[in-house]
Structures are given as structure tokens and as C-alpha cells.
UniProtKB/Swiss-Prot annotation:
ARM repeat feature ranges: 13-56, 75-114, 118-159, 162-203, 209-249
Keyword Cytoplasm: yes
InterPro entries documented for this protein: ARM-like, ARM-type_fold, Hsp70_NEF-Inhibitors, Nucleotide_exch_fac_Fes1
Family statement drawn from the similarity comment of this UniProt entry: Belongs to the FES1 family.
Organism: Kluyveromyces lactis (strain ATCC 8585 / CBS 2359 / DSM 70799 / NBRC 1267 / NRRL Y-1140 / WM37)
Predominant location: cytoplasm
Record key words, sorted: Cytoplasm, Repeat, Translation regulation
Stored SUPFAM superfamilies: ARM repeat
GO biological process, any: regulation of translation
Tree of life domain: Eukaryota
Protein name: Hsp70 nucleotide exchange factor FES1
Length: 289
């Protein structure tokens, strides 16, 4: 870069001697600086070619994934995944034996579909794609980072998209939440991702008796009640209170057994009340009295 600066100054001044001393700049560097390199769709294709190449090293594939994810943070580039037929090779990586690649494929997918209904629908139309993400999220033997990224991706796929939530529901997606929350070996980060997915579901599901029955059938109400304890992660407690608050606001009624556990739970978390969301706490506290 310093050499390019000297050359630029000498060239502007018309100093032949100084230009000779500076030498010719690197053509590739000039391309990068003045926009003469490949356009972003081409870079996306190149990155996916590396990712899909069985001869490429893991390190090179991870670098290519990193570059690809930075590119698709742009909405137009995210939508170009479909236009350039790159969803299929990306979805194929979800079956790769290397967990780092599976995690990156999920991360890229989650980023591409975030607040982007066009890319959400593009992904979901591929046969078995949503089911693969659900399977990766639910697998207890799966790599922890892969599971965390899978929950992130599911949340971003479902958010503000009723059609994809309906597909998720048809695949019994809600049943993957309680096992994570009950798993003593699951990280708090994974449990927070599971609660984030649950919160996202509440924004698109029909809040009716059938949905409430599903929450009970999949042990979600019972399991979340167990987090109302001061020794639990405060962020998890907050997530649970928000979950209950949203249910209460749409007319959900706790059973007698659930209400008794709720009363005990609210009493248990009184010592940390000041560190919790005030509105959610008071809503749940009022019902528990």
C-alpha cells in the first residue's frame, strides 16, 4: 500500500525519476482499490465452488464460508442465493461429516433468511430442508455449536412467516424445545436459543386452545415452570417470564397444578426481582396470586 502511495504521488506530479523509483503497483491491488475485480455474485459463486470442492482443505472451506456469509448479509445478495441456484449446494453441507461446516451452513442460512421472507420461502421450498434443520437442532449427540446454530436458523426461518411455521408444526417442531430445556448437559446458550425459538413461535402461531394443548402435550409449560428459580440463569428466567406473560395476555389459563407451581416459582424468584423485566414479572405475579 505504501508503494502504491509513492507511485500515485509521483504519477500525479509527473516525476519520471520518482515513478521509476516507486516501480509499478500490484495490478491486483489496483483492481481491489478501483473496483476492477469480480462482482459480488461472482464472488459468491467462487466461494460456493470452494465449499463444494471435495479436494479443498477444511481451512479453505471455512474461509470461503466466512466470505460467503459477509456477502449475503446484503439483502440483494441473500436473495441471489436462489437466483444463482446456490441453495441446493448450501443445504447439502448440512449433511457434511465435518461439524464446523454444518455449523457454518446453518449460520449462513440463518443470516440469509433473517427478516427476509423471500429467502425464507426460497429455502423452505427445497424438499427436506426444514426437516434437516429440525433434526440438527434436536440431536442430543450432535455437536453443541451445530445445535445452537440450528435453533438460530429455525427462529429466523419462522419469524413473521406463518407458512413456514405451519410446515414446522407439521414436522412436530415444537417437540424439540422441552428436551433441550430439561437436558442437564445442554449449555445455557443452547437453552436460550430454544427459548428464543419459542418466543418466535408465539409471534406467528394461532393463540387458541389447540395451540395451548400442543404446549402441554410437548411438556413445554411444565418444563418452563422449572426455570422459576433464583439459581437459574437470569436471562433464562426473563425469557420464561416473557413467555408466560405473552400467554397470559392472549387468555391462556393455567391448570390448578400449573398454577400451584407458578405460585411457588414466583415466590422463589423474589430475591432477583429487581434484575428481571418488571412488566413481565408483574404480569405473571398477578396471575399467581
Amino acid at each position: 500500500m505504501e508503494k502504491l502511495l509513492h507511485w500515485s504521488i509521483a504519477n500525479a506530479q509527473g516525476d519520471d525519476e520518482a515513478k521509476a523509483r516507486a516501480g509499478q503497483p500490484d495490478p491486483k491491488l489496483l483492481e481491489q482499490l478501483f473496483g476492477g475485480g469480480p462482482d459480488e455474485p461472482t464472488l459468491m459463486k467462487h466461494a460456493m465452488a470452494v465449499i463444494s470442492n471435495p479436494e479443498a482443505t477444511l481451512e479453505n472451506k471455512l474461509v470461503a464460508f466466512d466470505n460467503f456469509e459477509m456477502l449475503i448479509e446484503n439483502l440483494d445478495n441473500a436473495n441471489n442465493i436462489e437466483n444463482m441456484k446456490l441453495w441446493e449446494p448450501l443445504i447439502t453441507v448440512l449433511d457434511d461429516p465435518e461439524p464446523e461446516l454444518r455449523a457454518f451452513a446453518l449460520s449462513v442460512t440463518g443470516t440469509a433468511v433473517q427478516n427476509n421472507d423471500q429467502s425464507q420461502n426460497n429455502f423452505a421450498k427445497y424438499d427436506g430442508a426444514l426437516a434437516k434443520v429440525i433434526k440438527l437442532a434436536s440431536g442430543r449427540a450432535e455437536d453443541a455449536q451445530v445445535r445452537t446454530k440450528a435453533f438460530y436458523t429455525l427462529s429466523n426461518l419462522i419469524r413473521h412467516n406463518k407458512l413456514i411455521y405451519d410446515q414446522f408444526n407439521q414436522l412436530n417442531g415444537l417437540q424439540i424445545i422441552a428436551p433441550v430445556l430439561k437436558d442437564a448437559n445442554a449449555s445455557e446458550k443452547l437453552k436460550l436459543r430454544a427459548m428464543a425459538l419459542l418466543s418466535t413461535v408465539l409471534t406467528v402461531a394461532d393463540m387458541n386452545a389447540d395451540f395451548f394443548a400442543l404446549l402441554r402435550a410437548y411438556n413445554i409449560i411444565e418444563t418452563t415452570l422449572e426455570f422459576l428459580h433464583p439459581e437459574c440463569n437470569l436471562y433464562l428466567i426473563d425469557r420464561v417470564l416473557n413467555f408466560f406473560s405473552q400467554l397470559i395476555n392472549v387468555g391462556f389459563e393455567f391448570s390448578a397444578t400449573e398454577l400451584e407451581k407458578l405460585k411457588v416459582g414466583v415466590k422463589n424468584i423474589e430475591p432477583v426481582e429487581a434484575q428481571l423485566n418488571e412488566d413481565d414479572y408483574k404480569t405473571v405475579q398477578y396471575v399467581s396470586k
